[in-house]
UniProtKB/Swiss-Prot annotation:
HAMAP family: Ribosomal_bL12. Forms part of the ribosomal stalk which helps the ribosome interact with GTP-bound translation factors. Is thus essential for accurate translation. This is Large ribosomal subunit protein bL12. One of its GO terms (biological process) is translation. Pfam families: Ribosomal_L12, Ribosomal_L12_N. It comes from Levilactobacillus brevis (strain ATCC 367 / BCRC 12310 / CIP 105137 / JCM 1170 / LMG 11437 / NCIMB 947 / NCTC 947) (Lactobacillus brevis). PANTHER family: 39S RIBOSOMAL PROTEIN L12 (PTHR45987), LARGE RIBOSOMAL SUBUNIT PROTEIN BL12M (PTHR45987:SF4). One of its GO terms (molecular function) is structural constituent of ribosome. The keyword rRNA-binding does not apply.
Amino acid sequence: MAFDKDTIIASLKEASITDLSDLVKAIEDEFGVSAAAPVAAAGAAGGDAAGAKDSFDVEMTESGDAKVKAIKAVREITGLGLKDAKGLVDNVPSVIKEGVSEDEANDIKEKLEAVGAVVTLK
């Protein structure tokens, strides 16, 4: 099947957001794919796997259903303003805090999981 890429792009530019959202869902259903961004695999960088890790990055991979509570928790943990905290929660996966000790990382993880977020430590 031949198609003109420029014609399709022009048609998409004219479509409403609702129509585009419906189109994405239909494509996902038809082809069994997801429009979600892929998450990088942990541990791909190598390094000393047997050694104890000194610092951890706390990454929120899912914000959960209670986004307002997640935003409040992120603000409390990071000291960020409302807009920045909301940006982290809305754009998961996102690193909440970098280079923290294991104890602090686990405390942050517990706080975020308590409000329904899914968190990984890297």
